[in-house]
């Protein structure tokens, strides 16, 4: 593994550089789909941490419902101007982008993105309980043609935490989904999302998660700290019931370090922590509104302690 870009962990930018041979950036598009925790199937108030936007970033908030091509044409000029990228991936980010019984609709929106002359591949955010056999077949078919990354919302492997987060699935569901992806859609690059810092997490949850991912076949991991945002169930609990503990930057960094040390060095890290893109809606932890302070703190903390991804991997 090439740690040259980063001495502590395998970076996503390095991984994309290897895949595409160029700087690559994601362009957010909306699929118009919802989630089983929003439409009444598993509940109506969404996962406890998720706000009205369905976990989207700033760039994803304009243009929902327009055709995929229109959305890409609208966003690409601004992104080209802001980021010196040569390659672009269409990123179906918000809500659950495989959640429909109509697989022809999925094929239509994915193909629309892939047929755009400037798009080199797809990133699709989804849940482990929203992958039918038909969807896996479609994903594999597309992934044999073009780069396709599936961002899988695992969040935790611990059932107590998944219940506390009101995810509507258990840890085994994620393990099973990763196995089915490995067997039925081996060309898909799976990236698992994890949240550290729920008060229900066991002390050894970072190591447990790393070990489960090591044997899962995933290519990457995206890490988030637990954040309390306005317009979420967590915010309601925080205000109406009791303030639960959230991790300080140092505590979170310690958990990430333990996770990294047990993680296979071949698995790339797409993100070390999440940035709250709407500062005015962040309740806690306050460090989540800063981009560079946590980044620099974590790098320094790792350097001071000689933290390296995979140092305890066996």
Regions found by a protein language model. Name each.
Residues 1-89:
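N-terminal [4Fe-4S]-dependent radical SAM core
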Residues 2-14, 23-24, 220, 227-314:
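Auxiliary Fe-S-binding modules of radical SAM enzymes
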Residues 25-29, 88-90, 122-124, 148-152, ...:
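Hydrophobic faces of well-ordered beta-strands that scaffold small-molecule active sites
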Residues 46, 86-88, 118-120, 146, ...:
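Short loop/turn motifs at secondary-structure junctions
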Residues 47, 110-119, 208-222, 293-308:
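Structural recognition of alpha->loop->beta junctions
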Residues 57-66, 94-107, 122-185, 196-216, ...:
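Conserved non-cysteine loop/helix-boundary elements of the Radical SAM core domain that shape
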Residues 75-116, 121:
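A contiguous, low-structure linker/loop signature
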Residues 116-119, 180-190, 216, 254-268:
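A structural motif corresponding to the C-terminal end of an alpha-helix
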């Amino acid at each position: 593994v090439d740690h040259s870009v980063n001495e502590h962990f395998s970076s996503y930018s390095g991984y994309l550089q290897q895949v595409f041979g160029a700087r690559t950036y994601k362009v957010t598009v909306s699929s118009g789909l919802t989630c089983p925790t929003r439409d009444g199937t598993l509940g109506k108030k969404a996962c406890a941490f998720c706000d009205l936007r369905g976990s989207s970033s700033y760039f994803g908030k304009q243009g929902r419902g327009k055709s995929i091509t229109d959305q890409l044409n609208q966003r690409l000029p601004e992104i080209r101007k802001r980021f010196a990228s040569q390659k672009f991936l269409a990123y179906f980010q918000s809500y659950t982008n495989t959640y429909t019984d109509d697989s022809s609709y999925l094929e239509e929106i994915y193909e629309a993105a892939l047929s755009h002359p400037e798009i080199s591949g797809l990133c699709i955010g989804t849940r482990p309980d929203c992958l039918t056999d038909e969807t896996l077949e479609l994903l594999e078919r597309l992934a044999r043609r073009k780069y396709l990354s599936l961002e899988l919302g695992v969040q935790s492997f611990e059932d107590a935490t998944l219940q506390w987060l009101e995810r509507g699935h258990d840890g085994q569901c994620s393990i099973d989904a990763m196995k089915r992806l490995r067997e039925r859609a081996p060309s898909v690059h799976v990236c698992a999302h994890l949240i550290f810092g729920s008060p229900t997490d066991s002390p050894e949850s970072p190591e447990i998660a790393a070990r489960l991912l090591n044997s899962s076949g995933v290519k990457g991991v995206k890490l988030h700290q637990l954040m309390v945002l306005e317009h979420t169930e967590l915010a309601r609990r925080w205000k109406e019931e009791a303030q639960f503990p959230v991790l300080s930057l140092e505590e979170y960094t310690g958990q990430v370090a333990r996770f990294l040390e047990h993680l296979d060095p071949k698995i790339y890290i797409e993100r070390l922590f999440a940035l709250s893109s709407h500062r005015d809606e962040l309740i806690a932890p306050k460090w989540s509104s800063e981009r560079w302070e946590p980044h620099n703190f974590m790098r320094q903390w790792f350097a001071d302690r000689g933290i390296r991804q995979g140092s305890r991997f066996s």
